[in-house]
């Protein structure tokens, strides 16, 4: 085991604080509408230019291992805030730096770190209550768009596109952001349920121009296993032919004589049919087939349930208004499923989302909810160069997360004023001793940091701006860095999602409290390895002159 380097008390805290300052100083220049960009070097390709706090934080790795500990702890604040709220990472970093700085000074002056931390936690809880009480629910299209515009640094098109996407797919719908080939923003909305499986044979195509198989008002057979034996599906095929309606078959796979017979019948015009593979793999495939069955009011034909293919009747099949199948995707529009059953299914999946600890599983479950409850929208971001596209995509991602957060927990006035005015709720809060009271005062002072930084990035004196706002009696008035005026921020559309502001403060207070209470730091000692010996000559080379 390698030898360890151990630093104690003041020496450890000073080094950790240096790391915190280096990371925070790089991140906080991006805060606010007039925040600057940061250029990130890449081992391959062009450098990346970003104004996204968490992207900057993730790139920073320091040479001194103790300074790096501080930087990595602060990076954790940005990452955690990003995971929970999707935005507010720079605000969280600025708050954490302010709390750590003041806390370290107090510890150096001889105060009890544990009582300081208790005071910080008390104050953070009180401020969160204040934010929740001031929060206003988001109701209309304009408010949703405004949250997106603010988070995307005043880019109106971004805000409008996100609001449009949300309006079309609903609050539960999935909205994804992709890079586009052109210069502009594009919005593609997929109605109904879409899954990534295309037709099994091009002979199923009904529209050769678009290379699409389209079925109007089809029956849908949902089968869990492989289909290779023709005899098992003959009875249901005959029933469908008599009904005169098209048929879509979804199964694990369809091969051999079963597929050949379907293709021949389609070409002869005896049966309008198309076949696709079932989406997903393993247990997830079965769950998705059950979703399709509920959406189309059909039954999943599974031998586990004792249903054999030979015994399937028409009333066991699902149906939909329209099905469209391309080479890659199948879209089921307007399934005949009962709304209350679909709602129950969505609730069941939601409870699975709450229970899961895996990010991947959570993402897949959320996709299933969206496909059942709303739809899928894709925002395609364009630009003149690859660097510009990536920078715009970062901003759209942030704006999308902020908008979702606003829909969940509502909005508060932006520009850092929600936190600044929350200092007034701490006036009546008293700690049990002087050290706890100092912890409360540290948070009170730190709550001014976001307003100060936004003003500073806009070229103003942060302390003067914060002082002027605190001395004023109107908690609706804030400093609008975009217009450089003091005005009613909520009325002019400068708003922040409550969830983003709340999460930023909670994560900052949590990690800052841990750093303040650190008394020793342990790192690996660099090993002095002896230089390797010169390799010996190769055999059989004797007698040669060099």
Swiss-Prot record:
The keyword ATP-binding applies. Keywords: ATP-binding, Chaperone, Cytoplasm, Isomerase, Nucleotide-binding. Residues 536-546 have a biased composition (Gly residues). This is Chaperonin GroEL. Coiled coil: none annotated. ATP binds at residues 30-33, 51, 87-91, 415, 496. It is found in: Cytoplasm. It is an enzyme of class 5 (isomerase). It catalyses: ATP + H2O + a folded polypeptide = ADP + phosphate + an unfolded polypeptide. GO terms for biological process: protein refolding. PANTHER family: 60 KDA HEAT SHOCK PROTEIN, MITOCHONDRIAL. Residues 526-546 are annotated as: Disordered. Forms a cylinder of 14 subunits composed of two heptameric rings stacked back-to-back. Interacts with the co-chaperonin GroES. Together with its co-chaperonin GroES, plays an essential role in assisting protein folding. The GroEL-GroES system forms a nano-cage that allows encapsulation of the non-native substrate proteins and provides a physical environment optimized to promote and accelerate protein folding. GO terms for cellular component: cytoplasm. It comes from the Bacteria. The keyword Electron transport does not apply. Its EC number is 5.6.1.7. One of its GO terms (molecular function) is ATP binding. Signal peptide: none annotated. Belongs to the chaperonin (HSP60) family. Its main location: cytoplasm. It comes from Zymomonas mobilis subsp. mobilis (strain ATCC 31821 / ZM4 / CP4).
